[in-house]
A protein has these predicted regions:
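Noncatalytic regulatory segments and standalone regulatory/sensor domains
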Residues: 141-178
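Ordered hydrophobic segments in well-structured contexts
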Residues: 1-3, 123-127, 132-134, 161-167
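Low-complexity, compositionally biased segments
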Residues: 11, 23, 85, 92, ...
Length: 178
């Protein structure tokens, strides 16, 4: 079972990456943000990690035993799996995300619409206000908070627009073998 943890910036300056992509990987898996950034660089070939896309952090989560599944909310607030986005190529997916910016529901509206879905232990990864955040029940963590806080905490940007939602699940041995 996945649980939210504080962001692990390590003990030295070399261990620290202050950006949100490595921070959410760290908060969910426990590795340092520097290690998360190194793994993202391995998958992307980029020299430095200062911003990430969903397709850049997904393989890192997979390497660490976490499955990132796209999800959407229908008009009634129910989560529905979004296989269409999964089938789009990377450029089309990025264009789709860029087109969605400025539209869609706010983080506060998403919280209200998903009260029932958030009552269990499901972890959600959201792209909210061009920033990665993790939510489990009424707990929230991101690179800005650094630690697990309530969704009502002042550092939580409730008016930010949600542009992407993913369900985070632990990969069991049978899924990994397939």
């Amino acid at each position: 079972m996945l649980t939210l943890n504080s962001v692990n910036h390590g003990t030295t300056k070399r261990d620290k990456n202050r950006f949100c992509g490595p921070a959410v990987i760290s908060a969910l898996t426990g590795i340092t943000t520097a290690e998360a950034a190194r793994r993202i660089r391995e998958h992307t070939g980029r020299r430095q990690i200062t911003g990430t896309w969903g397709d850049e952090i997904k393989p890192v989560f997979a390497d660490l035993g976490v499955q990132m599944t796209p999800a959407r909310i229908d008009g009634n607030g129910y989560l529905i799996s979004d296989l269409l986005i999964e089938m789009l190529d990377v450029k089309a997916q990025r264009r789709h995300q860029a087109d969605q910016r400025g539209s869609g529901m706010t983080f506060a509206a998403w919280l209200k619409a998903t009260e029932r879905e958030r009552s269990g232990n499901q972890v959600f990864l959201l792209s909210s206000g061009h920033h990665w955040v993790l939510v489990q029940r009424d707990n929230f963590v991101c690179g800005k908070t650094g630690e697990v806080v309530s969704v009502d905490h002042p550092k939580v940007k409730r008016r930010a627009r949600v542009s992407g939602i993913w369900l985070m699940n632990q990969i069991n041995d049978q899924q990994a073998a397939a």
